[in-house]
């Protein structure tokens, strides 16, 4: 029977053991746990709390356990309820009674919290790197299609012409904000709880700053009650992940639509599509669809953690064991989504000719014709009404703007002159030459800005 049940006269019910164990999932914290324990043992020796010999024996044993886990020879025993007890149990087997000194001036409460802080810090770094990779692929495609125009949409209706790089860089901007959020979230994870004990601190002369420095933390926690029971840093990661996955879901939706036969704006590479079990002609955008579907999974992780935390009194409660599965699943899901999306976008083949054909539909120059009338002295509101009636007429006549005669134009306003035919896709794009606009000059600047952002982040493009 585990030493933590010394208070009890009989072992836990077998069902209770299965119900309460976290070892099947929190084993993933083994590196963080061994790293924290190593730093703690070293500090205990420096402070004269345990002997140098015991400290070194503990550290040697922990290194041996790390090797066992990473080579697959470590035996995860079901009776050890979590990774922390599994490692400690094995440490006793390797070095004997000296292992019992490791937990001096430490509780599993501050131990677990510190492990998870380290995990989330690392997760933030990895997530940011994966976002940067996806940004790089978007930028590559933007640079490869500097003059490709397509319809911009509102309400899924053709609205105004934009350049493809402008569209792709919109997602670059979303992902840039995601990077900012994860960078900021990392600051809250970069605080070390170790030394807080179970809830009230510890009665030993610890050097918390020494441990924080060895573990790479920028600060130590300032309130032991808060330190062992707060999971804000997890919630912040999950919140940021939900927003990031939502951005990927939006891009997924467009890849699904754009790759359809009705649009055919893009052809997804065979490596990122699947077939049908019955329809031989199918090339399904399953990767994009799954990314869209997995967004609910990431949202679920956030909702799980918010629900776990909503009614917890200070300080530690066993409910907090439920923080790890949603965290791990979210980190994995978002990470996989970012990686697979980078590959899918990198290998996608955009179809400029199909985009150009779509621009010929939907009277995409209507706003520009209204602006033309404004330039002739008409108010915009009157111009809007004139062009709305002009569109209705063109639809009824089954004509494009370019097919209307000047006489037909002048049925709606005498301000129309021959130069109305100079209003075309190229002029519409060039006219939007303000920062943030879709004009070619602005796109060139936007690409240069994106390249600078990635270069400063250490990403080669």
UniProtKB/Swiss-Prot annotation:
UniProt cross-references to PROSITE patterns, sorted A to Z: FUMARATE_LYASES (PS00163)
Alphabetized UniProt keyword annotations: Amino-acid biosynthesis, Arginine biosynthesis, Cytoplasm, Lyase
Segments traversing the membrane: none
Recorded GO MF terms: argininosuccinate lyase activity
Location of the protein in the cell: Cytoplasm
The keyword Secreted is assigned to this record: no
Catalytic activity of the protein: 2-(N(omega)-L-arginino)succinate = fumarate + L-arginine
SUPFAM superfamilies, alphabetized: L-aspartase-like
Alphabetical list of CDD domains matching this protein: Argininosuccinate_lyase
Amino-acid biosynthesis keyword on record: yes
A matching Pfam family: ASL_C2
Cellular-component GO terms for this entry: cytosol
EC class: lyase
GO biological process: arginine biosynthetic process via ornithine; L-arginine biosynthetic process
NCBIfam families assigned to the protein according to its UniProt record, in alphabetical order: argH
Protein name as it appears in the record: Argininosuccinate lyase
Organism of this sequence: Dehalococcoides mccartyi (strain ATCC BAA-2100 / JCM 16839 / KCTC 5957 / BAV1)
Organismal lineage: Bacteria, Bacillati, Chloroflexota, Dehalococcoidia, Dehalococcoidales
